Amino acid sequence: MKTFYVASYGKGNDKGIYIVSFNEETLELKKIQQILTQDFPSYLIAKNKELYVSYKNAKSNNEGGGLGSFSIHKNELILNNNYSSSGRSYTHLCISDDNKYIFAANYHVGATAAYKLENYRIDHKIGAVRHTGMGPDLLKRQTAPHVHNVGFTPDRRFLYAVDLGADKIVMYNYKDG
């Protein structure tokens, strides 16, 4: 039996985060738990018995979007906290190896954000860097920055942000803090 997590943009009571089990012998899927969310969960990371989620703003104002942190207890998710990004919608996340920081890619405004984690909770926003530039396809998707992925280089010396809109990879020196 394997357990995994699903983020859903569903409508009404279908929206949220699901815990699903998969029986490899019978090929049966079973919904274990659903957590209804106000915003659209768009990306999930499970690490160290914690689940981190990025939310796409589902509201027409700047109150939604952001990050969430859940503790994983057997087959149940328990909310640690949510942290609003004031309408910003993150599309990808990564966590530092020491579990002190979470980094977020914001496709819609073309920015990379950093948050401090404290006891696996999202404590506060450290800052954000807005990207600049355009890519070669000025008639469609590359008229402005669109950061869609963040991660660490294999040697962990740099945080990178892949920017589809600006058609570049931005490298940030990474040091603890």
What are the language-model segments listed below?
Residues 10-13, 57-61, 108-111, 166-168:
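Short glycine/acidic-enriched loop and turn motifs that connect beta-strands
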Residues 16-18, 65-68, 111-113, 168-170:
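A short loop-to-beta-strand structural motif that recurs across blades of beta-propeller domains
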Residues 7, 54-56, 105, 162:
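Residue-level marker for isolated small/hydroxyl-bearing positions within beta-strands
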Residues 13, 39-42, 89-91, 146:
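Beta-rich catalytic cores
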Residues 46-49, 95-99, 154-155:
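Residue-level detector of Asp-centered blade-edge/turn motifs that repeat once per structural unit
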Residues 21-27, 70-76, 115-124, 173-177:
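Short loop/turn segments immediately following beta-strands, especially the blade-tip
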Residues 77-148:
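Asp-box/WD-like beta-propeller blade repeats and closely related beta-sheet repeat scaffolds
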